[in-house]
Structures are given as C-alpha cells and as structure tokens.
Amino acid sequence: MAAARPSLGRVLPGSSILFLCDMQEKFRHNIAYFPQIVSVAARMLRVARLLEVPVMLTEQYPQGLGPTVPELGAEGLRPLAKTCFSMVPALRQELDSRPQLRSVLLCGIEAQACILNTTLDLLDQGLQVHVVVDACSSRSQVDRLVALARMRQSGAFLSTSEGLILQLVGDAAHPQFKEIQKLIKEPAPDSGLLGLFQGQNSLLH
C-alpha cells in the first residue's frame, strides 16, 4: 500500500506526539473558555496515555505564572519551563530523539502567541501540525480567530478533539476503544467556536 501523502494529514499513534502548552494557574481567569479548554486538553491527554502517544508539557515563566492547573491531570509529566513564545526550543532534544515523528497535536494557550509560534516552528521543520481547536484559546476571541486562520494559511490542520481521537484509535475493534468511547460519549464542552466559524466574513471560510 502506498504511503499516505503528507498533505492528507493522517494521524497515527506511532508517529504522533501531544504537546500541552502553558495551561497554568495565572491564566485561569484571563483566558476565554479556560475551563472548557483544559477539559478538552485533559481528554486528549487521557487518550494519549491509553494509546501510548508521547506527551510533552511546557510552562511559561512558572515563577510568575504559576504551575500547570491540576484539572489537566498531568501528574507524572515533567513540565519544561520556558520564556520563549514557542515550545520548540524547550523541546528540541525530544523532537530530535524521535526520527519517526510526523504529527504534532497541539493544545493550550495562547493561540496568537505560543500556539502560533510553536506551529510555525514545527511546520518549518517539516512536521505536520494538528491544532486542537477546542483545546486552544486566547484572552481575546479576535486573537483566537485570527491565529487559527493564520495557522491554517501556513499549512496547519485545524481539527476537533473528537476528530483526532477517532483518527488515532482508527477502529472500533481496537483493544482500547471501549475506554476511549467512554471519554467521547459526551461531546466536548462548548468553547465559543461556533461563532468564530459563522458569518460571511469569517476568516476561516
């Protein structure tokens, strides 16, 4: 069987990694839909653990912005501190150690800052980026919308958490499917995305 074309954006557990970006205490009351974003990212993390997809976690200037919020469920992950508005410099060694890596699944904040710059850095390295749109946000919905449009223009894939989860598991016969089915039985919480995609002037058309 011919290999999948990179432009298709297929996601497979053996060639993917989940990035969790800067979901920290000081952002809790400033980021639009923060509880919903963290809830979806936590769902992605649980699926990654079930399917043995590696996970990397960063914190932006934790001395000032605090630790990762506990509801993410990131116990056992070692957060990497950074000041750069991209995850890539902090994760360079991890990326270089995974020659089979093809796809990065990206969750976190803020869309117009660390998510955008991480996306551009990863695309520049020839990796596919799948922005989990219901697990990324900003303080401003305008910044969120424009950042999503910008990442799409640059070649990133915009995906929902459930779409990516079902791509990763691939088959209802998968031994972990019943556990994953429990996680997606309820739809992901509303994080204000529908309004961003509607209207004649939507940047995402």
UniProtKB/Swiss-Prot annotation:
Keyword tags: Cytoplasm, Nucleus, Phosphoprotein
- State if Transmembrane is listed as a keyword: no
Q: Which residues form a coiled coil?
A: none
Q: Where in the cell is it found?
A: Cytoplasm; Nucleus
What's a GO cellular component annotated to this UniProt protein? cytoplasm
Top-level taxon in the UniProt lineage: Eukaryota
- Which residues, renumbered to this chain, carry the PTM Phosphoserine? 7, 202
Please state the protein's primary subcellular location.
cytoplasm
Do you know which InterPro entries this protein is assigned to? Isochorismatase-like_dom, Isochorismatase-like_sf, Isochorismatase_domain
Presence of the UniProt keyword ATP-binding in the record: no
Annotated family: Belongs to the isochorismatase family.
Assembly, in brief, is: Interacts with CDKN2A.
What's the name of the protein? Isochorismatase domain-containing protein 2
Organism whose genome encodes this protein: Pongo abelii (Sumatran orangutan)
Ranked from the top, the taxonomy reads:
Eukaryota, Metazoa, Chordata, Craniata, Vertebrata
* Gene name of the record: ISOC2
